[in-house]
C-alpha cells in the first residue's frame, strides 16, 4: 500500500500540517525539521498529493459535516453539539445533508471535499452501509484527502476515526432486565439497517438466546420512524401478542405508546416500552418514556477532541466506545 501523509508524519514525528508545510517549502518550518521530513519522504518514495500540498498551508479552520437528514432529532442535536465543540477550538463548519440513498451519500462527500476543509465528520452509522468494499470505498478515498471522523459507526481503516455508543451492550442489558422482570414476549422495533441498528438488534437477539427464549421473526418489526405509522403498523400487521417493546429510537417508542392507548393496554403494568436516544420526545409523551441515553453530546465532544489531536500530529485510537445507560421514567416498572 502506498504511503500517505499520515504515515510520513508518524515516521517523522511531526504533525500532518508540518509535512504539508515542508512539501510547500514554507518558511515557518526550520531547516532541521525540513531535512528530517524530506529524508523520510525520500526513503519511503512518497509523492505528495493535493491534500498534502494544501493542508496547513492555507487552512481555513473549517470542518465539513455530512448527515443524512437534519430533520432527524438525533442528527440535528449531533450537528449542534459538533458546531459548539468546534467553535471552542476556533473552527467553523460547513453542513451538507446527503439523504439516505447510497449514490447521494457518495455525491455529498465528494462535493464537500471540494471545499477547503481541514477534516470531515460523518454523522450516523448509515454511512457504513453493510461494510462491503463497495459500500465504504468512498469513505476510504475521502480519508486519503482529509482526516475522516465517523459518529456511531465503525470502519476498519487507519485514517478513519470512529466514536460510537456501546449500543449492543446497553440493548443486551436492557432486554435481560425485562426478561428477569417476567417479560417474555418482547417486540423489537427498528427503522434502519445501519451499523448501529444491527448492533442493537444483535444485543436484543443475544439476550433472548442467552435467557433461553426463542427469536421470533414476527416480533422483529421494521417500520418507518413516524409515530402514527408505527401505531397503525402494530395495529394492522402484528397479530402476535407482546408484553414489552424495545426500540431503536424514541419516535418508534412513542408510536408503540399510541398503539397501547388505542388497544386499552395499561403501560407499564401490562406492557413496558423503551425508547432510544433519550430525546425531548421522551418527556413529551404521556406517560413519559423510559429511554436509553446514547451519550450523543459526549460522543460529539470526543470526536472533536480527537480531531484536534490528529490535526496536531498525535496518534490516537481509531475506535472509541462510549457506554450508554437507561433513563427510567413511567413506561417501565423493573
What are these regions (language model features)?
Residues 231-334:
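Flexible loop/turn connectors
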Residues 58-176, 235-236, 240:
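Alpha-helical recognition/docking segments in bacterial nutrient-uptake
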Residues 11, 16-21, 55-71, 121, ...:
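Short beta-strand segments enriched in small/hydrophobic residues
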Amino acid at each position: 500500500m502506498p504511503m500517505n501523509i499520515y504515515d510520513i508524519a508518524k515516521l517523522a514525528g511531526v504533525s500532518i500540517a508540518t509535512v504539508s508545510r515542508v512539501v510547500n517549502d514554507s518558511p515557518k518550518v526550520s531547516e532541521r525539521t525540513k531535512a528530517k521530513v524530506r529524508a523520510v519522504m525520500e526513503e519511503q518514495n512518497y509523492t505528495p498529493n493535493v491534500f498534502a500540498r494544501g493542508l496547513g498551508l492555507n487552512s481555513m479552520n473549517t470542518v465539513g459535516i455530512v448527515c443524512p437528514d437534519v430533520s432527524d432529532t438525533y442528527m440535528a442535536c449531533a450537528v449542534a453539539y459538533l458546531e459548539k465543540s468546534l467553535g471552542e477550538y476556533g473552527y467553523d463548519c460547513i453542513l451538507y445533508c446527503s439523504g439516505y440513498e447510497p449514490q447521494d451519500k457518495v455525491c455529498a462527500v465528494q462535493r464537500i471535499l471540494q471545499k477547503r476543509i481541514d477534516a470531515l465528520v460523518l454523522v450516523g452509522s448509515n454511512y457504513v452501509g453493510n461494510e462491503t468494499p463497495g459500500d465504504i470505498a468512498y469513505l476510504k478515498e475521502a480519508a486519503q484527502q482529509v482526516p475522516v471522523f465517523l459518529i456511531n459507526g465503525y470502519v476498519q481503516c487507519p485514517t478513519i476515526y470512529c466514536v460510537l455508543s456501546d449500543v449492543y451492550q446497553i440493548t443486551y442489558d436492557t432486554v435481560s432486565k425485562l426478561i428477569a422482570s417476567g417479560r417474555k414476549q418482547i417486540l423489537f422495533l427498528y427503522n434502519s439497517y445501519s451499523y448501529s441498528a444491527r448492533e442493537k438488534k444483535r444485543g436484543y437477539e443475544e439476550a433472548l438466546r442467552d435467557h433461553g427464549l426463542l427469536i421470533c421473526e414476527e416480533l422483529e418489526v421494521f417500520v418507518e420512524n413516524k409515530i402514527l405509522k408505527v401505531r397503525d403498523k402494530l395495529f394492522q400487521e402484528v397479530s402476535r401478542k407482546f408484553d414489552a417493546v424495545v426500540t431503536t429510537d424514541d419516535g418508534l417508542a412513542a408510536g408503540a405508546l399510541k398503539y397501547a392507548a388505542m388497544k386499552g393496554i395499561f403501560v407499564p403494568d401490562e406492557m413496558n416500552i423503551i425508547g432510544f436516544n433519550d430525546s425531548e420526545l421522551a418527556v413529551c409523551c404521556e406517560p413519559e418514556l423510559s429511554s436509553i441515553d446514547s451519550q450523543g453530546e459526549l460522543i460529539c465532544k470526543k470526536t472533536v477532541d480527537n480531531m484536534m489531536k490528529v490535526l496536531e500530529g498525535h496518534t490516537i485510537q481509531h475506535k472509541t466506545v462510549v457506554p450508554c445507560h437507561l433513563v427510567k421514567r413511567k413506561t417501565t416498572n423493573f
